Every structure is written in structure tokens, then in C-alpha cells.
Amino acid sequence: MAMGRLAHSIVVLAAALAAAVAVRYLDNDYHLRIAFTMCTYYLCAAGMNVLVGYAGQKSLGQAGLFAAGAYAAALTSSHTELSAWLALPLAAAVAALCGVLVALPSLRVKGPYLAMVTLAFGVVVEKLVSEWTDVFGGAQGLYGIRPLTWNDQPFTSEQWVWFGIALCAVTHWLLRNLLAGRFGRALLSLQADEIAAASVGVRVYRAKVMAFVVAAVTCGIAGALVAQQNQYIN
């Protein structure tokens, strides 16, 4: 088992390094933006795999969690003097809190009804950011979002992609190790039969909440990255 994990870690590291080297051969800013967008999509998909693929929970509200992370980073970067780097963990924390709120109904509703509840969360977020213009800027959005920096200089397009690749590799490694253990087995048991899972000691509701939080955090970080790279969000 230990050798298998080590081999997988080496493969992930090698793939990340190969992707980072390949970035040097992308010849224009458009291609670099596409590569960066692929990284953010991977972060969202990795979290969704935990929630849907392992825990079997249906969610249609990930766009709302993406927006929560994006606006948290935008407000932190544009309305405070805090470092843009601190906006990332703050965005993850806000998204995690929203993930807990979305998970609360999962104790009572399941299947398509849970999907409808999560969809309603996304609608509420969309209405909130579009109607509360004093805070979120409404249709005009938020400008002046400070990007991530290196040596006091804003990230270049290449650096954004390199950072995205690094985050994807770390996220993949962390989630794989997390899901290979007790937590992953608990989530798979939920997908198979919640009653049977509870009968063998799995804390069903806690496992559901943790799955929602993991998916929310990855989406929130992806949203924060998009807001900081564009320096504008609406």
C-alpha cells in the first residue's frame, strides 16, 4: 500500500512537471488562459467527484459555491489592505461555510429533492449578488481586485498556469490519500446504503457534511482564482 501511494505520488509529480514545462511552449495569452481555465475546472471537478462520485449526493448548486469564493476573494482584495494571498484561504473558508449550509437539508431530503435544494441555493446567491448593489456591485460587478503577486509583481499569464497546475496536483494528491482511507470507505458506504452504513458505525450525517464541505472548498478556491486573475467579477 505504501509503495503504491509513493508510486502514484511520483506519477502525479512527474505529470505536473511535464505540464509546467509544456506551458513554456504555449505561444499566446489566449492559450495560457485556456490552460488556466482547465486548472480551475479541474479543481471544481475534483471536489464534485468526492460529493457525487463517492458520497452519491446530488448537487446542482456548485455555481453558487464558485461565486461565494469569487466574491469573498474580490471583496477582500478590493475593499481591504489584506494580502491577495490571504484572500484564497478566506474564500475557501467562506465557501466551506456555505457548503455546510447547503448540507443541512441533506439529513431530511435525498435524491432529486436534495438536488432541488442545492439548485435553490445557487439561485439565492445569484439574486443576492445581483440585487445587493452596495456590496456586490450588481450588474456592474466589482473592479480593482488585486491579483496574486510574486516578488511584488503581479502574476504573469505563465505564472497563473503554473500556480494552477501546482494547486491541481496538490489537490489531487490530498484527495486521493483522503479517499483511500476510512473517509473514502465511509462515503462509498453512503452511496450503497445509508442505513447499512449507519448500522456498522458510519456517522452518516457527518460524512455527508464533510463531502459537501470538500466540494465547496475546491469550488470556492477555483472561483477566487478566476476573480483574482481577471481582476473583475460580476
Regions found by a protein language model. Name each.
Residues M1-N234:
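Transmembrane alpha-helices and adjacent helix-loop boundaries
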